[in-house]
Amino acid sequence: MTSILDQDIMYLPGVGPKKKEILSKELNIHTWGDLLEYYPYKYIDRTKIYRIMELSDDMPFVQVRGKILSFEEFPMSARKKRVVAHFTDGRGIVDLVWFRGAQYIYKNYKVGEEYIVFGKPTVYQGRYQFAHPEIDRVADLKLEEMGMQPFYMTTETMKKRGMQSRAVERLTKTLVTRIPKGAIQESLLPSMIGRLNLISREDAYRKIHYPRSLDDVQRAQVRLKFEELFYVQLNILRYASEHRRKYKGYVFGKIGPIFNDFFAENLPFDLTEAQKRVMHEIRDDMRSGHQMNRLLQGDVGSGKTLVALMTMLIAIDNGFQACMMAPTEILAEQHLSTIRAFLKDMPVRVEMLTGMVKGKKREKILHDLAEGKIDILVGTHAIIEDTVQFKQLGIAVVDEQHRFGVAQRAKLWGKSENPPHILVMTATPIPRTLAMTIYGDLDVSVIDELPPGRKPIMTIHKYDNQTVSLYNGIRQQVREGRQVYIVFPLIEESEKSDLKNLEDGYKKLCEIFPEFRLSKVHGRMKPSEKEAEMQKFVNGETQILVATTVIEVGVNVPNASVMVILDAQRFGLSQLHQLRGRVGRGADQSYCLLVTGYELSSETRKRIDIMCDTNDGFRIAEADLKLRGPGDLEGTQQSGIAFDLKIADIARDGQLVQLARNEAQKIIDDDPRCEKTQYSLLWNHLKELRNTQINWSAIS
């Protein structure tokens, strides 16, 4: 059914072909509905009038009321002049300044007339001024209708073509007045609206663009944010419910001799309570008859690999094979080494398949895999190639999930008669509200404690001028037999940046530490060169590894005890935490040194303080989300389960995310097949919102 909101934006009074082109190209606004959902990013209270004597240069946008006393002109060049209007409210004087548009100014603003002036006060030559302010003639205003003024994001192109926030505001107000009452269809159930004390969808649209008070803004935002989050959650849970019905999983009902022998003889230490809890959750999944789709979160060193191995042993005890995919060859080798060390002489065959495995060795692995003679295959993307066939793949473990595309994981499905159980591991802590939105279709397990005896990493902030003590500390650590990472933000010198670069830094460090062996690793090296340099460090052949952030994920060198991050202000919290996680893997005390200049923004200082204050990855992830925002909700578009969030903010709307989740769960619990007529309003609206039918969520 065609709605008034489907009308082309060109047919809105005040738009026309030229503005239509700008709106569509710059803001992706094509219809009335698109404009209605282009929400303001902030509001200013226009009911408050300040006296000129009250102004200060640290004020945000304010307004004053008064009369123009006189105009003055100051030449800036042969063809340009600055126009200044001296403006008074009877008690003080402020200057209104324009650097262009003199003809328009003299035509529209008159000496002696009363105006309301709106802008940001600044000080110039000892006097307050408003540069290019908004001015309204008091005689033209309905003062009783002045309320909250919305502000809309615009692009540089729009500003150059005269379409700033005020122009968008005029269009939205025209739109709101043109839409007949009752023309906007409700998208939530009346019972839900009443129970949650929400305003109607129509009221919310009107008030979000044309509020009379702060209460109008808040009630409109709550309604529209909740609606957005509710449909994201409803879609996620609908997919998950459909997946549980459609895709049967292998039932791993027994714990057999391999698992029991490993647990009794080979387990290197007692499991933490968190590991035990996660194993129970995984066991419940594997014997449920449904395919497991579980995200396993755990900070660096929390014991995720051991949990993954025990999970794979359960599959082997039940007559199945297992695989583990890692994003790089060196990580695959580390997993292979770790798993073999755990298993010792147990009758479990573990092999590795990467792009480097070629010739007869590769043929042998592929043959034995298809025959069922290999129990666990560790590898990289090579595992998902068409030539790789398992006899019966029961579980796939994917390490560091963000390095694999969804389509790549989908190829795992072709490796077995039924879809294998999926366990996705990540050492990147994901805040609860974000996980609920991006990975909401996965069950989430968290290992939130480290094995006993592990010493917390000491994080210290140092300034650029403290490098002598820094280098002395590094020298002492290396002499005691430890290894050190030194991370640079850049590979080579940049004309536009005074940041330290790796190439120059490596040469200087070789001069500072002539008695030690250094490796260097960066993203422009050939993969084989990078792997070789990394392997030297892993094997202890070099003591100092000079690198960019390519060492951010997964590398395990227990002997490395110092992480130095230069120009640490250039890195986000999550990245700093991941880099820090390269150390602290052995029994010795480890250190992370964040080196910066003295001039730091308040946000950078917050990041540094948080890093020095805590090693808790989940606290850091929550803080990072609040400081940085969720960006584009990494993965939501390719996952096919979430929609663009136009007003909700995952970082700041955590309570609404949880509320939306709870309400969506109630609907799914009552109508898992999405067929009850009492919910047809919801299912029809969800169908309109969905932009893909690919069930990526079933693959995680």
Regions found by a protein language model. Name each.
Residues 249-257, 448-451, 586, 634-639:
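Flexible hinge/switch segments at interdomain interfaces of large molecular machines
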Residues 74-266, 670:
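Upstream accessory/linker segments immediately N-terminal to the RecA-like ATPase cores of bacterial MutS
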Residues 38-65:
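OB-fold nucleic-acid-binding modules
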Residues 515, 534-544, 551-558, 563-566, ...:
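Accessory helical-bundle/CTD segments and flexible terminal tails appended to RecA-like ATPase motors
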Residues 1-13, 25, 232, 242:
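Long, highly charged, low-complexity intrinsically disordered interaction regions
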Residues 277-280, 291-610, 673:
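Inter-lobe coupling/hinge segments of SF2-like helicase ATPases
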